[in-house]
Amino acid sequence: MSSIIFIPNDADNINSIMVTISSSLSLVGCLFILSIYIYYKELREFQLKLIFIMTINDFIISIIFLIATHIQTKYFDAITNVFPFFCNFPDSLLHYFFLSSFFWEVCIAHTLIQVIKYNNDKVEDNLKKYFIFSNGLSALIMVSLFFIRSYSKIDCHHDSIFPHLLFFIPLLLTWIYNIIVCALLTKTFKEQAMNFGYSLGINGGSGSYINFTNNNSIDNYSNIIIKNDLIINNNNNINVNNNNNNINILFHVNVNNNNNKIIIKRIRKTPNIIWTSIFFLFSFGFIWSWSILVIILKYLSLDVKYILMISYFFIPLHGCMNAVCFGVNDRLRMNLKKSCKNYYYKFLGLFSLDKRKSYGINGNNKNNKNNNGANCEERSLIDYSPDDDDDEDDDNNNNNYSDGNYYQIPSPFLIDSRNSSNLTDYSVILDNNNNNNNNGPYNPTRSNSITELLYNNINSLNAIRILSNNNNNNNNNNNNNNNNNNNNNNINNNDNNNNNNNNNSFCTIDEDETK
């Protein structure tokens, strides 16, 4: 019998099945996070690196559960006979790796509070300290447990209090520390929202709008971070300096033409990192509360059969819970969605001309070269060129796609800015990330600071499309005006031709009269 009950007995078939199901779910979740970290190089940041290391611990835990559940305990008795302080070798391994996983969760929470509350941009220097804290402290606890068992002659019965204290005390401290971090993060975001209101001159920091009149310049607020909706009026009198690179827009941008002012609308929205912390706290407490309840009922000599069965199912789900809470975020979903679109378009044969027409790419229109900006909203985000077999058909249709490879088009914002002349007034605001980063074109998934990265709510593509619609409407109006002017010119030309014909008829000389 193990002092910490992780693995059911050989005769417990139902409990073994439940452990197998839950540990398999955790194994799938861990493999998903590990694969994502290896495949997407742009996501290999410090925060995900910590999650990657914690996921390795959870992966090992899932493997131990699966192996120990389907192998009889007599095969581990040889190790127990040589090292009696192990009591049960698989349970001792699980004890160590669970402690290591708890401490890595503490390190992740510490990183969040350092970045968000204290604006510490050197948290990557703490990686070695995190390794020593997580793995070293876990090993120290296990060594102390083995020392107590060896020299105090304590048996391996489940009623022994020392293993329980050395496991559940770190567990409870981890949960309490994450509660404190969640409370501090919530308080910090509220303070930042209030300070944002005061910096813009909003009374009490709780107002909804700030107006920039014609005499004001947005450069006066060049160091703020806009975490709300920004409504920019299309007014050329407002001064937006191209050197303003420090305004960061994290949500939408809308365009109005009501008055001569810029309106910043403040929307109160709880950041996703807060919801992630809350979800982690509830799931962590729910998973381990059953195990704590089993220990309490055992000390009270009460029946724990059904509660122990629930505990066997939920304890191996610890890795799956970590994968869902920490691994699945907005940036990951955005990259997965983009990859799915790429493979979907590639393998369903969207290289042909007819399929491209269905996505708004018209190859028969000769004026398509000059109307790329007007058709930007109708395009798919990823354009593909035809394969080698379709080259002749595309040449006959005057199509611009003649390569044999597919490629990703530039950012939609760059297309809009090149083909829309009225976008220059706001390009400095929307393109601030591009100006601050010299590694390539604008990327909605890229963040200029670790603090901004934690929001994971960049929705600037919708803003760009709104601006594109406004500019496209202006271009359409200009085209209509030009067409009207051309029609008027044609009418005038027809009138002139009629007048000339009349003049010619009056100037004709009859030959009979001359004779």
Swiss-Prot record:
<keyword id="KW-0297">G-protein coupled receptor</keyword>
<feature type="topological domain" description="Cytoplasmic">
    <location>
        <begin position="38"/>
        <end position="50"/>
    </location>
</feature>
<feature type="topological domain" description="Cytoplasmic">
    <location>
        <begin position="328"/>
        <end position="515"/>
    </location>
</feature>
<comment type="similarity">
    <text>Belongs to the G-protein coupled receptor 5 family.</text>
</comment>
<feature type="transmembrane region" description="Helical; Name=3">
    <location>
        <begin position="93"/>
        <end position="113"/>
    </location>
</feature>
<keyword id="KW-1133">Transmembrane helix</keyword>
<feature type="topological domain" description="Extracellular">
    <location>
        <begin position="72"/>
        <end position="92"/>
    </location>
</feature>
<keyword id="KW-0807">Transducer</keyword>
<dbReference type="InterPro" id="IPR017981">
    <property type="entry name" value="GPCR_2-like_7TM"/>
</dbReference>
<keyword id="KW-0812">Transmembrane</keyword>
<feature type="topological domain" description="Extracellular">
    <location>
        <begin position="1"/>
        <end position="16"/>
    </location>
</feature>
<dbReference type="InterPro" id="IPR000832">
    <property type="entry name" value="GPCR_2_secretin-like"/>
</dbReference>
<feature type="transmembrane region" description="Helical; Name=2">
    <location>
        <begin position="51"/>
        <end position="71"/>
    </location>
</feature>
<feature type="topological domain" description="Extracellular">
    <location>
        <begin position="151"/>
        <end position="164"/>
    </location>
</feature>
<keyword id="KW-0675">Receptor</keyword>
<dbReference type="GO" id="GO:0004930">
    <property type="term" value="F:G protein-coupled receptor activity"/>
</dbReference>
<feature type="compositionally biased region" description="Acidic residues">
    <location>
        <begin position="385"/>
        <end position="396"/>
    </location>
</feature>
<protein>
    <recommendedName>
        <fullName>Cyclic AMP receptor-like protein G</fullName>
    </recommendedName>
</protein>
<dbReference type="Pfam" id="PF00002">
    <property type="entry name" value="7tm_2"/>
</dbReference>
<comment type="function">
    <text>Receptor for cAMP.</text>
</comment>
<feature type="transmembrane region" description="Helical; Name=1">
    <location>
        <begin position="17"/>
        <end position="37"/>
    </location>
</feature>
<dbReference type="GO" id="GO:0005886">
    <property type="term" value="C:plasma membrane"/>
</dbReference>
<dbReference type="InterPro" id="IPR022343">
    <property type="entry name" value="GCR1-cAMP_receptor"/>
</dbReference>
<feature type="compositionally biased region" description="Low complexity">
    <location>
        <begin position="469"/>
        <end position="504"/>
    </location>
</feature>
<feature type="topological domain" description="Extracellular">
    <location>
        <begin position="298"/>
        <end position="306"/>
    </location>
</feature>
<feature type="transmembrane region" description="Helical; Name=4">
    <location>
        <begin position="130"/>
        <end position="150"/>
    </location>
</feature>
<feature type="compositionally biased region" description="Low complexity">
    <location>
        <begin position="397"/>
        <end position="407"/>
    </location>
</feature>
<dbReference type="GO" id="GO:0007189">
    <property type="term" value="P:adenylate cyclase-activating G protein-coupled receptor signaling pathway"/>
</dbReference>
<feature type="topological domain" description="Cytoplasmic">
    <location>
        <begin position="114"/>
        <end position="129"/>
    </location>
</feature>
<dbReference type="InterPro" id="IPR022340">
    <property type="entry name" value="GPCR_GCR1_put"/>
</dbReference>
<feature type="transmembrane region" description="Helical; Name=7">
    <location>
        <begin position="307"/>
        <end position="327"/>
    </location>
</feature>
<feature type="transmembrane region" description="Helical; Name=5">
    <location>
        <begin position="165"/>
        <end position="185"/>
    </location>
</feature>
<feature type="region of interest" description="Disordered">
    <location>
        <begin position="362"/>
        <end position="409"/>
    </location>
</feature>
<feature type="topological domain" description="Cytoplasmic">
    <location>
        <begin position="186"/>
        <end position="276"/>
    </location>
</feature>
<keyword id="KW-0472">Membrane</keyword>
<feature type="compositionally biased region" description="Low complexity">
    <location>
        <begin position="362"/>
        <end position="375"/>
    </location>
</feature>
<dbReference type="GO" id="GO:0007166">
    <property type="term" value="P:cell surface receptor signaling pathway"/>
</dbReference>
<feature type="region of interest" description="Disordered">
    <location>
        <begin position="469"/>
        <end position="515"/>
    </location>
</feature>
<feature type="transmembrane region" description="Helical; Name=6">
    <location>
        <begin position="277"/>
        <end position="297"/>
    </location>
</feature>
